[in-house]
């Protein structure tokens, strides 16, 4: 059997969909599972166990210049890549017009079908064409976690039952990032810094300002971690985030700033940390998928939809929610509980 997953973006949504691959392979061990995704997120999929083929696209860029010769050439190449195989099932797990169009372009086997969601779920995007262009539109419970939504849709479409807990299937190689370290005078030097059992990564970057945690809170938490014997490592994905990372690191006794690096290398670094503290962002969700001890911070009450499953992780991964933002003390207490659970 050949299956195609269409989940193009964003990073967090792609990560939340990863367990579908393992669910399908558990039900159909000889299945070929392919995935269409935005090119910038493809490095994460390259680390997924059992995924046969990654089909990258750049719809975000192409739609800005579709009528140029270069874009049209790239679009034709993408279509040729997409239509190389005929699929027994095409799963539109995104529920947007763009994903519906991609799913419609995929070729089917004689008995093949396209599946999609029939309705919106709370807090997630949905556009009606996704159900119009599918052979089968599956009704979803409106109040559902992002991970559970994709798993349920695929299971109902393909007729199998999945286990209660999600297996994200990430297989990560060791990674030693070049980092910036700050001494007491504020001078910067580059070092080869392999994360260790005493490294805690901070993931402060997010695409939404209302999800950010105050800079002073990061500094205060970092100081507590330093006092407890932990080094702090700071990730970033843009010049603005890099500046914030450097500002936090400069105020800590033991901190490093990782360089801008591909997502698979970020995942490799996170996998070797003692734990991660991060806001609701794609990189934080990678930490969850890696089963790294994790405290995820929420200024908005959406942890029920995107946060880690504290029960499945046996307390190794938790969410902390408060408005306008979680306090340093609350996050510190959560971290201590996570450490106790992880080392107990």
Where are the language model's segments positioned?
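Catalytic machinery of carbohydrate-active enzymes
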Residues: 1-344
């Amino acid at each position: 059997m050949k299956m195609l997953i269409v989940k193009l973006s964003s990073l967090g949504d792609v990560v939340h969909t990863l367990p579908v691959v393992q669910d399908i392979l558990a039900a159909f061990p000889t299945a070929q599972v392919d995935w269409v995704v935005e090119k910038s997120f493809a490095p994460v999929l390259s680390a997924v166990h059992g995924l046969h083929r990654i089909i990258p696209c750049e719809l975000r860029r192409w739609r800005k210049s579709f009528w140029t010769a270069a874009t049209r050439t790239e679009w034709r190449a993408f279509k040729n890549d997409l239509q190389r195989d005929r699929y027994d099932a095409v799963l539109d797990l995104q529920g947007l017009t763009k994903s519906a169009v991609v799913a419609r372009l995929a070729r089917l086997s004689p008995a093949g079908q396209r599946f999609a969601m029939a309705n919106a779920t709370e807090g997630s995007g949905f556009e009606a064409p996704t159900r119009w262009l599918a052979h089968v539109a599956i009704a979803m419970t409106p109040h559902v976690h992002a991970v559970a939504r994709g798993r349920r849709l695929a299971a109902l479409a393909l007729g199998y039952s999945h286990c209660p807990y999600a297996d994200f299937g990430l297989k990560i190689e060791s990674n030693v990032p070049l980092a910036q370290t700050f001494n007491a005078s504020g001078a910067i030097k580059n070092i080869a810094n392999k994360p260790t059992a005493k490294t805690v990564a901070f993931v402060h970057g997010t695409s939404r300002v209302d999800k950010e945690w105050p800079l002073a809170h990061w500094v205060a938490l970092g100081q507590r971690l330093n006092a407890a014997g932990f080094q702090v490592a700071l990730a970033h994905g843009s010049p603005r985030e890099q500046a914030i990372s450097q500002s936090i690191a400069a105020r800590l006794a033991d901190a490093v700033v990782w360089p801008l690096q591909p997502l698979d290398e970020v995942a490799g670094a996170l996998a070797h940390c003692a734990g991660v503290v991060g806001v609701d962002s794609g990189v934080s969700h990678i930490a969850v998928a890696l089963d790294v001890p994790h405290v995820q911070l929420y200024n908005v009450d959406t942890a029920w939809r995107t946060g880690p499953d504290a029960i499945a992780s046996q307390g190794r991964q938790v969410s902390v929610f408060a408005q306008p933002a979680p306090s340093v003390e609350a996050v510190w207490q959560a971290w201590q509980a996570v450490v106790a659970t992880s080392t107990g």
